[in-house]
Swiss-Prot record:
The lineage of its organism: Eukaryota, Viridiplantae, Streptophyta, Embryophyta, Tracheophyta. This is F-box/kelch-repeat protein At3g06240. It comes from the Eukaryota. It comes from Arabidopsis thaliana (Mouse-ear cress). Kelch repeats lie at residues 224-270, 316-362. Residues 30-75 form the F-box domain. Keywords: Kelch repeat, Repeat. Gene3D superfamilies: 1.20.1280.50. NCBIfam families: F_box_assoc_1. InterPro entries: F-box-assoc_dom_typ1 (IPR006527), F-box-assoc_interact_dom (IPR017451), F-box-like_dom_sf (IPR036047), F-box_dom (IPR001810), Gal_Oxase/kelch_b-propeller (IPR011043), SCF_F-box_component (IPR050796).
Amino acid sequence: MKAIQLLWEAIMEATKRERRREDDDGEKASPESLVLPPEIITEILLRLPAKSIGRFRCVSKLFCTLSSDPGFAKIHLDLILRNESVRSLHRKLIVSSHNLYSLDFNSIGDGIRDLAAVEHNYPLKDDPSIFSEMIRNYVGDHLYDDRRVMLKLNAKSYRRNWVEIVGSSNGLVCISPGEGAVFLYNPTTGDSKRLPENFRPKSVEYERDNFQTYGFGFDGLTDDYKLVKLVATSEDILDASVYSLKADSWRRICNLNYEHNDGSYTSGVHFNGAIHWVFTESRHNQRVVVAFDIQTEEFREMPVPDEAEDCSHRFSNFVVGSLNGRLCVVNSCYDVHDDIWVMSEYGEAKSWSRIRINLLYRSMKPLCSTKNDEEVLLELDGDLVLYNFETNASSNLGICGVKLSDGFEANTYVESLISPNSYGIES
């Protein structure tokens, strides 16, 4: 990668010299005088990081055309995903704590404990219209014009508010920066698309008053990005609908007989081609892992391990995640826990096993492994924690210039050129 970068810098310098010669002579260079044929330049560009390619857009028409071409973006992404060592170089951590920040994932595995962060100008970051919408949803239409409310709530406080990270896939991050607003956002290129509003179930008067959760993932069979939304229409019924980026529209799927709990307020986790939550099955009052298959758009159940239900706390609930390529669930309540339940064989109920960790927690979610699979990044009781399963050692990570808020969110993404605005357009 370093050699390619150096070669590219040499090409850039030669291109600049050629431009200066054109300016001095007052004529354009012939194709024979180009430094390298376009096809060679394309091959070199394909092996550069997405961020570097973006910086070269203004160099020439060829570079600008390639960097914004959907077909080029897909080939570039495929080269990244095909090789694990290359993919790890392009992986980033995105954190939501008042604002959105990206962290260099490799620096975590290199032993750096105070991480540098890049703040993002995500969609609607300073948009006053979203602030107005938030106030209306918060206080209700009948109080919206009350000046006393406006004195307590202001746009400055909103800009320091919450951004929900729904999920990520192939460089696109699904975020919800305000009431009713959902975006597909590429942190690498800055491209974004606001998704159309979903239709409201007939039995729901105001969606903001009802439980709702999202899940985001990629359908490789149809080359489509999908967002599934679940809304509670009663205590034991969830209304399911799905958004297709290709069609740019929502479709209602079905009703589900599940009760939500506190842990299910978190977004679903994308793993093994499906989105996962933990809900309570209404008829038997039994908690299950519910999986939404992104390709077939069907729901299926997997049992939660029986022993994991031993927690007697009345507000006990489960959070689903992934750990070293395996599905896992963790208990989250006001009692402390020290274990993680891992499914060794996906879909096999008998493959659940308990892993004890040398940490006590009330709320915890595994985020991802570092370059060394023995180390895992955890979102633990409001802290970002690096845990080593081999030595049972742990360390809290800090982010330079960022104070993590209680209940911050984090996810991983890969740097890519994929644009949410290019779908439905032939490359």
